[in-house]
Amino acid sequence: MTGLVLLYSGVFVAFWACLLVVGICYTIFDLGFRFDVAWFLTETSPFMWSNLGIGLAISLSVVGAAWGIYITGSSIIGGGVKAPRIKTKNLVSIIFCEAVAIYGIIMAIVISNMAEPFSATDPKAIGHRNYHAGYSMFGAGLTVGLSNLFCGVCVGIVGSGAALADAQNPSLFVKILIVEIFGSAIGLFGVIVAILQTSRVKMGD
């Protein structure tokens, strides 16, 4: 563990030292104009941003679902050794975790249907509408992906507690299940916000 901490600390220090040296050199030699965020945003294609949003929506949602299933499943299997009756009933927690991935897939399909081809290649000809659409799709994908990531972890931890509590006292299952339902609503909040972000998106010529 100490070796990993030293490795990560060394990488962290080296990264910031390199960044500091480059920044000082660019400042001394008056080359600061090369750090141009506006140039990067206008020279990249709106399709890149929309596809990044689609990829983030699916990948982060699947990571959240897998993480939640891992946390819940290990507790169900461990508690099922002592109390085999909990194995079937606590599969509800697995279903809640899997729903998180479904939210991401649905939102990725919605975003991909909004992407329309356009013929322009010059940044001025592409227009603000297409850039706005690309950035909005990226933001929507990031929103739903991160919310589903944390939703999956939340549902997994609560589901793990529900399985262990049910193994000890069956009357606690329904009470903890209510907490799990509220935890799974976090993913729905992300989907709703992502839909609002892309509600006025128009792409194409």
From Swiss-Prot:
List residues in topological domain: Lumenal.
Answer: 1-3, 73-90, 159-175
Q: Which family does it belong to?
A: Belongs to the V-ATPase proteolipid subunit family.
Gene Ontology biological process terms, A to Z: pH reduction; proton transmembrane transport
For this protein, the record's Pfam families field holds: ATP-synt_C
Note the subunit structure: V-ATPase is a heteromultimeric enzyme made up of two complexes: the ATP-hydrolytic V1 complex and the proton translocation V0 complex. The V1 complex consists of three catalytic AB heterodimers that form a heterohexamer, three peripheral stalks each consisting of EG heterodimers, one central rotor including subunits D and F, and the regulatory subunits C and H. The proton translocation complex V0 consists of the proton transport subunit a, a ring of proteolipid subunits c9c'', rotary subunit d, subunits e and f, and the accessory subunits ATP6AP1/Ac45 and ATP6AP2/PRR. Interacts with IFITM3.
This protein's major location comes to: membrane
Tell me which GO cellular component terms the UniProt record holds: clathrin-coated vesicle membrane; endosome; membrane; vacuolar proton-transporting V-type ATPase, V0 domain
InterPro entries according to UniProt: ATPase_proteolipid_c-like_dom, ATPase_proteolipid_csu, F/V-ATP_Csub_sf
Superkingdom per UniProt: Eukaryota
| Topological domains annotated Cytoplasmic | 25-51, 112-137, 197-205
Q: Which GO terms describe its molecular function?
A: proton-transporting ATPase activity, rotational mechanism
Keyword terms, alphabetized = Cytoplasmic vesicle, Hydrogen ion transport, Ion transport, Membrane, Transmembrane, Transmembrane helix, Transport
- Per the UniProt record, which residue ranges are transmembrane? 4-24, 52-72, 91-111, 138-158, 176-196
Q: Which organism is it from?
A: Bos taurus
Subcellular location per UniProt equals: Cytoplasmic vesicle, Clathrin-coated vesicle membrane
> What is this protein's tissue specificity according to the annotation?
Expressed in brain (at protein level).
| Functional summary from the UniProt entry | Proton-conducting pore forming subunit of the V0 complex of vacuolar(H+)-ATPase (V-ATPase), a multisubunit enzyme composed of a peripheral complex (V1) that hydrolyzes ATP and a membrane integral complex (V0) that translocates protons. V-ATPase is responsible for acidifying and maintaining the pH of intracellular compartments and in some cell types, is targeted to the plasma membrane, where it is responsible for acidifying the extracellular environment.
What protein name applies here? V-type proton ATPase 21 kDa proteolipid subunit c''
